[in-house]
Regions:
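Conserved structured core elements
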Residues: 39-46, 63-66, 93-96, 100
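Globin-like tetrapyrrole-binding proteins
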Residues: 28-29, 33
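GST superfamily/GST-like fold recognition
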Residues: 62-82
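Single conserved hydrophobic/aromatic residue that forms the stacking wall/gate
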Residues: 1-12
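All-alpha helical catalytic cores of prenyl diphosphate-utilizing isoprenoid enzymes
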Residues: 13-24, 35-52
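C-terminal non-catalytic accessory extensions
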Residues: 186-236
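Surface-exposed helix-capping loop/turn segments at secondary-structure junctions
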Residues: 54-63, 112
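Active-site/pore-lining binding-face segments in mid-to-C-terminal subdomains
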Residues: 75-188
Length: 236
């Protein structure tokens, strides 16, 4: 009976394994992943890892000595690429061990409270002592990079995003506005074709809305930072 039970369990496991694998593989075209774009995706991922390796040699986080929302956004993607999928994980280990370590660090940024919290680790002095609030970074600009002295590594990351991802974001938004189910565009000399995603169109809209909320000086600082990278196109 025990042998039969194990055999049934293995059959069920294999069946669900095939179902899940086929479901994910068959959805690759939806996000633009196919034989035509494979090399583009592969090369961009490797370039990004090389740029991250360079950047993390100088700074522990994207914009300085403390994590920003951008760090957590990148972390969310990299948890899958570095910590789950074996193919991109192996590439990451070869090209950028610092990125692998960074993902692990980001996974354990706990303790944003007062005494002994991670705020003290970053050298940030809390202005309000309240153990019930994550208040170390409230109204505190400590640790951000000087916008007048942006590291080349960060500029190069923006350039990669502007070259590969921003054209996708813009083309998807235009297709969504027109009601097109599928769109295509040229990215770094390769044809990119995929299904239109409403969520990405909303993301682009949110970015513009948040940019419009900035003061005139902050808008100028932002544009100065990304000017020439291609990223400024999403704010037009």
């Amino acid at each position: 009976h025990a042998t039969l039970r194990r055999q049934r369990q293995m059959c069920i496991r294999d069946r669900f394994s095939d179902i899940i694998a086929n479901r994910q593989i068959n959805r690759l075209w939806v996000v633009g992943s196919n034989n035509d774009t494979a090399n583009l995706i592969d090369q961009s991922y490797k370039r990004y890892l090389s740029l991250m390796e360079k950047h993390l040699k100088c700074l522990p986080f994207m914009f300085g000595q403390r994590p920003s929302s951008s760090d957590f956004a990148l972390y969310g993607q990299l948890t899958q690429l570095v910590g789950f999928d074996p193919t991109p994980r192996n590439i990451a280990y070869q090209i950028s061990p610092r990125t692998v370590s960074w993902v692990n660090v980001m996974s354990d940024l706990s303790g944003l409270h007062d005494s002994g919290g991670i705020g003290e680790f970053f050298g940030v002095q809390s202005k309000k002592k309240d153990n019930n609030k994550l208040n170390y970074f409230e109204d505190n600009d400590y640790g951000w990079i000087d916008t007048n002295n942006i590291p080349d590594s960060l500029i190069e990351i923006f350039n990669e995003v502007g070259k590969v991802y921003i054209p996708c974001l813009i083309a998807n938004a235009k297709a969504y506005e027109k009601g097109d189910e599928i769109w295509e565009t040229s990215i770094d000399g390769a044809l990119w074709k995929q299904k239109t995603f409403p969520y990405q169109a909303k993301c682009l809209k949110w970015i513009k809305m948040e940019f419009d909320k900035l003061s005139a000086n902050d808008k100028k600082s932002t544009l100065d930072l990304i000017s020439g990278s291609g990223c400024e196109s999403i704010l037009e």
